[in-house]
Regions:
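Generic structural signal for small/hydrophobic residues in well-ordered secondary structure
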Residues: 64, 96, 103, 109, ...
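Conserved HGGG/HGGXW glycine-rich cap/lid loop of the alpha/beta-hydrolase fold
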Residues: 60, 65-123, 158-160, 171
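Catalytic histidine neighborhood in serine/cysteine hydrolases
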Residues: 320-336
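Active-site loop/oxyanion-hole signature of alpha/beta-hydrolase fold enzymes
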Residues: 57, 69-71, 111-158, 170-173, ...
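Short glycine-enriched nucleophile-adjacent loop
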Residues: 162-174, 180
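Alpha/beta-hydrolase fold catalytic core
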Residues: 1-82, 104-107, 124-138, 150, ...
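Catalytic histidine-centered segment of alpha/beta-hydrolase-like enzymes
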Residues: 310-311, 334-344
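Flexible "cap/lid" subdomain of the alpha/beta-hydrolase fold that forms the substrate-access gate
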Residues: 6-16, 134, 138, 175-322
């Protein structure tokens, strides 16, 4: 496994980009407005964001969406289970705005914006290797657990968040409950063993994706405005033709929040250079290989959209090798972003399995 699951990377020197207080205040007000209007039946008291300071890279914090903070602070968390959900690349916890209200009331739900993404701190970190890059995100999840005094929790993750979630569970199995849920995870299959993570893309989508990923790998870090406002936006939109059932009002506020993510200081978008092989989204360290080397003593539940462009083949192949020990669900008539597109079906699977 390259050793990184059992070694601690040296923390980089302390430096964080300053964030404009006025921009931060405006962003947080928009988030509160959205939660108040569109996360019914939850209220702002029940579901809200909080900046959680973590002991990493100086004065860093994770901007974290929490349902049930009052229970979290009570002894034994008021006998409730804890679920931490990790978002994917260039996203934020808001991808779960429809899912959170549908999760069983048995759970306290915690959804951090990953370090360097969303409205979390923007540290200046120079990525140098795949191991070090993965470790940055995994260690920040662990720092969050420590700060919130959580002894054990269930972990879920969407897309790249699923990749980090599983690696976290392999590195810190003592803190993770016996079930892990991965939402359309990236980085599963080893293409040398069969399967292709672009199998479900149309020809036009493949051309666009290859072009976009190729450009991302050649642009310099100084071209932040180009990569953020055009290249990354184009990649996210062209990944698939999802038909989100979002109202115009919801979309307007979400669009404003998204644009504010791009107005924040430089983020950690360059992590993909060390996680994926150029130019296609094939992992440098496939989870298929990592799991084969060290089979987690956990039940893993995989959930994909029927038209998902993530590699379902690696999951099927892995499951066959391990005697079909993992659960595997396909949500019909949706793509990669089913937490927005087919949230009722996804919530049902989660509630039945955890």
């Amino acid at each position: 496994m390259g050793g990184y699951l059992w070694s601690s990377q040296k923390e980089p020197e302390n430096y964080n980009y300053p964030i404009d207080p006025a921009l931060k205040e405006k962003a947080y007000a928009l988030e509160n407005e959205f939660i108040s209007k569109y996360c019914s039946p939850l209220t702002l008291k029940e579901l809200h964001y909080k900046d959680i300071p973590i002991d990493y890279h100086g004065d860093c914090y994770l901007h974290t969406l929490i349902r049930g903070e009052e229970d979290l602070l009570k002894p034994n968390h008021n006998n409730k289970k804890i679920l931490i959900m990790i978002h994917g690349y260039q996203a934020s916890a808001f991808i779960y705005f429809r899912l959170i209200p549908l999760i069983s009331d048995e759970f306290i739900v915690i959804c951090p914006d990953l370090i360097g993404m969303g409205f979390s701190s923007r540290p200046k970190i120079q990525f140098t290797s795949t191991d070090q890059t993965i470790d940055v995100f995994v260690e920040c999840i662990e720092k969050l657990r420590q700060k919130l005094n959580i002894e054990k929790f269930y972990i879920c993750g969407h897309s790249l968040g699923g990749y980090f979630a599983l690696i976290y569970a392999m590195k810190y199995p003592q803190y993770v409950e016996n079930k892990i849920v991965l939402f359309s995870p990236t980085g599963i299959g080893n293409p040398k063993k069969g399967g292709n993570s672009t199998e479900n893309l149309s020809f036009g989508q493949r051309v666009t994706y290859v072009w976009t990923m190729g450009l991302l790998f050649y642009i310099q870090p100084t071209t932040q405005s180009l990569s953020k406002k055009y290249v990354l936006g184009n990649m996210i939109k062209s990944g698939e033709d999802d038909k989100f059932q979002i109202t115009k009002e919801e979309n307007d506020i979400l669009g404003q929040i998204r644009r504010m993510h791009f107005e924040y200081p430089p983020d950690l978008e360059t992590c993909i250079y060390y996680i994926y092989q150029h130019p296609l989204p094939t992992p440098i360290k496939p989870l298929e290989d990592l799991i084969e080397e060290k089979i987690p003593d956990k039940d893993i539940i995989f959930i994909f959209g029927e038209n998902d462009w993530m590699d379902k083949f690696g999951t099927v192949r892995l499951n066959q090798k391990d005697g079909n020990k993992y659960k595997y669900y396909i949500i019909p008539n949706c793509g990669h972003r089913w937490p927005i597109e087919k949230v009722q079906e996804g919530a049902k699977i989660i509630n039945e399995n955890l």
